[in-house]
């Protein structure tokens, strides 16, 4: 049993280590520290920090005969602050011997022991940590005095020690910092189910792992019908299902109107019948003024309208005096004027007036006098003759619109006037009266789609539409609550007879039954058929009999077997056969009885004029999957078709050369079961059935040897719609082959 070293032994070890590292020693040799091999620290779990408790066991150092340590086994002491707490430091140090020799002073000098000890130097920096030394042999020391507990050191690196005695409970410390979240614990055992609590509110749908099956609960009350969920994304196209037999369902309720689809492509301009005149639409907003148009041709002179009321008196500036015109023609004698006022009394006369003298010459026109005062308005004179047309004046201010005049007589068509300059655009006129509906024009091109208008009012309920095609299967919804048990339905109709199944394997032999009672003796049975036994052992030869009488002449015997083959004849000389004509078949070979076949169907004319012998043989492949049911399967891709006896348009092989034929077929199964039959003259001679497994591509094959005569037909056919999963693709081939074994 190892004894833990006390403080004196630890001091001795430390002094031995410090003295062993000094090179200058008077009586002894220096043993250098041999580097130790690298030690692999013990692997400990990462959750438990590596530590070394205080008071750990120091490895034992082997000693020499005189109690000194040997240099090669010098243990490595810990550096830094890892020294254990030593009470009464350097007070209980025992003298250490010097490698087996006492210290001898020099001649004439005596070195006191106290003088060898110098002053305590400053504490050096902790050196690097060395590798751990090899474990020493267990030492046997005297237990020392128990020292005072030292300060808590840094956690060491060592093996965990023996568990210590439980200490006194300390005072409650300050709450530590919140630690990191520990690893997730294992799932504990299922607890005892507690009492059922009140139903809580409906929570949000969570996403969790499926739990174990719970105990069956009591059926709850029937809940309200939930809202209709949005349609799920279209699923992948499933395999072709088997044809079902169901009763037609009731017509469904009319669904909500669908969203307005995008406008279709512009169609070709059609010519349709004129539609019914629609109601006038609401008045649109005022449009922007368009660019001024080109002046049109002058229209015919319109009917003069009724003279409007006189306008307001205008205020114009007086114009300049015009050039005096020529004197007009003398007017006619006017009417007698009114008698004038009596004049003043005249001067007294001188004499009587004389006779009037002769008319003198016309004098020069005098200067026009000043403008006299404006006379009174005379009576309206007779209309004068129309003067020459004056120059067109400036356009006046448009007057107010007068009342519509009566329709006058159409005037004569005037001459086309000179196109005047383009006037400024006039103000927008008032909307006129609605004209008569014009003739319907041709259907114009479809314009670009307009802005989507406001939703119109809800129209009347339409008639029930036709039943639509079944939609794509949606994503399976969440598992709903368990419904109430339904009413048992009526017994369904008996389905059609299914495909005959494959004969199952024979069951194991049952245990022997209990022997029954002894029966009565039966009636004697009819005589049995003559038995066929093995020939018995030949008996011994008897003595030779006496020669009998000569019998009648017998019938000629059967022909004997063919003799041995004769010597080989001279080599035959045959022209080479072109590549596309196949190999030579000399007269189609021998029959089964050794007789040559007839020459009626032995040869056909080849390209070079010689006979081209072909064997009735073919191989055809199917290129389209799922051929129709109840008709010959058309294997339409030919690999070889000798003598053209197979028709890829109908899928039927017609015999030309009588003989024994071999037929084989290879089909694939996908999306449903496969049941094919080999027919000879509309009669099935062989069936092949293969059951489809979801997710797998299976195959089936069959073959038969048939005796055919000229005109016989052979083909493959699907006899049932419930097993029509015959599949073919670009790299998955279903084939049909046949060839002549030997002619008859």
UniProtKB/Swiss-Prot annotation:
Specify one Pfam family. C1q
Query: Quick one: where's region Nonhelical region (NC2)?
Result: 29-117
Q: Does the keyword Signal apply?
A: yes
* Biased amino acid composition, Basic and acidic residues: 101-110
Query: Which residue stretches does the UniProt record annotate as biased composition, category Gly residues?
Result: 203-217, 328-337, 411-420
GO MF: extracellular matrix structural constituent conferring tensile strength
Miscellaneous remark of the record: 4 consecutive G-P-P tripeptides are present at the C-terminus of the triple-helical region. These may provide high thermal stability of this region.
Known role: Macromolecular component of the subendothelium. Major component of the Descemet's membrane (basement membrane) of corneal endothelial cells. Also a component of the endothelia of blood vessels. Necessary for migration and proliferation of vascular smooth muscle cells and thus, has a potential role in the maintenance of vessel wall integrity and structure, in particular in atherogenesis.
Q: What is this protein called?
A: Collagen alpha-1(VIII) chain
């Amino acid at each position: 049993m190892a004894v833990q070293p006390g403080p004196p032994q630890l001091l001795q070890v430390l002094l031995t280590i410090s003295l062993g590292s000094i090179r200058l020693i008077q009586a002894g040799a220096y043993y250098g520290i041999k580097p130790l091999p690298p030690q692999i620290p013990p692997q400990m779990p990462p959750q438990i920090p590596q530590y070394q408790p205080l008071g750990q066991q120091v490895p034992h150092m082997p000693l020499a005969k005189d109690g000194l340590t040997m240099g090669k086994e010098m243990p490595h002491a810990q550096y830094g602050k890892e020294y254990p707490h030593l009470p009464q430091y350097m007070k209980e140090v025992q003298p250490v011997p010097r490698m087996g020799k006492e210290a001898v002073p020099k001649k004439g000098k005596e070195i006191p022991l106290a003088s060898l000890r110098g002053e305590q130097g400053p504490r050096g920096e902790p050196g690097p940590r060395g590798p751990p030394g090899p474990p020493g042999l267990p030492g046997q020391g005297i237990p020392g005095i128990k020292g005072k507990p030292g300060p808590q050191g840094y956690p060491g690196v060592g093996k965990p020690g023996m568990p210590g005695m439980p200490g006194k409970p300390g005072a409650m410390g300050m709450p530590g910092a919140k630690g990191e979240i520990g690893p997730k614990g294992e799932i504990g055992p299922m607890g005892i189910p507690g009492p059922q609590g009140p139903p809580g509110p409906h929570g949000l749908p969570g996403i969790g792992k499926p739990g174990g099956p719970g105990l069956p609960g009591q059926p709850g009350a029937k809940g309200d019908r939930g809202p209709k969920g949005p349609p799920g994304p279209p699923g992948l196209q499933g395999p072709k299902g088997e044809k079902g037999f169901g009763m037609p369902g009731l017509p469904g309720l009319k669904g909500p109107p669908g969203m307005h689809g995008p406008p279709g492509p512009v169609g070709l301009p059609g010519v349709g019948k004129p539609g019914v005149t629609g109601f006038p639409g609401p008045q649109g907003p005022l449009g922007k003024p368009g660019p001024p148009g080109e002046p049109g041709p002058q229209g015919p002179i319109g009917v003069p309208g009724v003279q409007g009321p006189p306008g307001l008196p205008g205020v114009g500036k007086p114009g300049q005096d015009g050039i005096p015109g020529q004197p007009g023609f003398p007017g006619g004698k006017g009417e007698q004027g009114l008698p004038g006022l009596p004049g003043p009394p005249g001067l007294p006369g001188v004499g009587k007036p004389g006779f009037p003298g002769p008319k003198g010459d016309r004098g020069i026109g005098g200067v026009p006098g000043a403008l006299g005062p404006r006379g009174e308005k005379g009576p309206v004179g007779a209309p004068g003759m129309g003067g020459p047309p004056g120059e067109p004046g400036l356009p006046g201010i448009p007057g107010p619109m007068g009342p519509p005049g009566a329709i006058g007589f159409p005037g004569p068509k005037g001459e086309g006037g000179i196109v005047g300059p383009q006037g400024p655009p006039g103000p927008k006129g008032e909307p006129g009266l609605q004209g008569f509906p014009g003739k319907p024009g041709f259907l114009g091109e479809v314009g670009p789609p307009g802005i989507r208008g406001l939703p119109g009012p809800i129209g009347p309920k339409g008639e029930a539409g036709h039943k639509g095609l079944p939609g794509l299967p949606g994503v399976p919804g969440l598992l709903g609550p368990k419904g109430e048990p339904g009413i048992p339905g009526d017994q369904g109709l008996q389905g059609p007879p299914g495909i005959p199944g494959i004969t199952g394997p024979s069951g194991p032999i049952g245990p022997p039954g209990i022997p029954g009672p002894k029966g009565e003796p039966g009636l004697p049975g009819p005589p049995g058929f003559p038995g066929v036994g093995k020939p018995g052992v030949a008996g011994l030869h008897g003595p030779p009999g006496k020669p009998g009488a000569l019998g009648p002449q017998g019938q000629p015997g059967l022909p004997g077997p063919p003799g041995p083959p004769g010597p080989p004849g001279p080599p035959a000389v045959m022209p080479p056969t072109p590549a596309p004509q196949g190999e030579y078949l000399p007269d189609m070979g021998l029959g089964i009885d050794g007789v040559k076949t007839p020459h009626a169907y032995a040869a056909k004319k080849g390209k070079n004029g010689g006979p081209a012998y072909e064997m009735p043989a073919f191989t055809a492949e199917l290129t389209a999957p799922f051929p129709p049911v109840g008709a010959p399967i058309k294997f339409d891709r030919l690999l070889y078709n000798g003598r053209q006896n197979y028709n890829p348009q109908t899928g039927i092989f017609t015999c030309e050369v009588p003989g024994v034929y071999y037929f084989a077929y290879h089909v694939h199964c996908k999306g449903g079961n496969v049941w094919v039959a080999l027919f000879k003259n509309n009669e099935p001679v062989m069936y092949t059935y293969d059951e489809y497994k979801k997710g797998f591509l299976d195959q089936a094959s069959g073959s038969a040897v048939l005796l055919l005569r000229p005109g016989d037909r052979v083909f493959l056919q699907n006899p049932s719609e419930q097993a029509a999963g015959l599949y073919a693709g670009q790299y998955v081939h279903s084939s049909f082959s046949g060839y002549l074994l030997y002619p008859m």
